Amino acid sequence: MHAPRSQHPLLAITLTIAAASVGAQAAESPVDPCDTAQHHQFDFWVGDWQVFDAKTNQLVGFDHVEKHSHGCIVQQNLTMLTDLYRRPGVAFRLAGIGVNRFDGESWLEMWADNQWGAIVLKGMPEGGKAMVLKSITPSRNRDLRLVWEKHPDGSVRALQYVAPAGSEKWELYGDLIYRPNR
């Protein structure tokens, strides 16, 4: 036969303190699912940028790139100032939004703009200094490959390649230099 609870007050107090301690530890050290090395691989691109055509050094746009949702999302807001990416017949210049997220295995970008529609890209860093994303499905019968390279001076070079769908025959389509907007 077991003794009534009142006869084991020390055990009851010990169990209560242990339970409170476990609960306090859980409350003090919450898990941040997006604070991993992989989730920081695109941090070099976060900032306010002036965007220049690498060939002419002409200012062609502005891009605001920021982290959202506890650092889980990298969001891009691009506004072009020139006709560099204007689609024929469209009365206004390119503006668009990119939402980037590391999914545990690779980076995904969902891009939508006022010219070309929507593109979904996927990829990872390559060679230790460049982020490389490729379109998952063709857009207008073309594949797209984007490469962001961080430079020692703090600038970022964005190379854009296109290829006929499924061919892997990449041609340089755009070469942009991102410089901090001061």
Predicted feature residues:
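Bacterial N-terminal signal peptides that target proteins for export
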Residues: 2-11
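Hydrophobic small-molecule pocket/channel-lining residues, especially in calycin-type beta-barrels
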Residues: 26-182
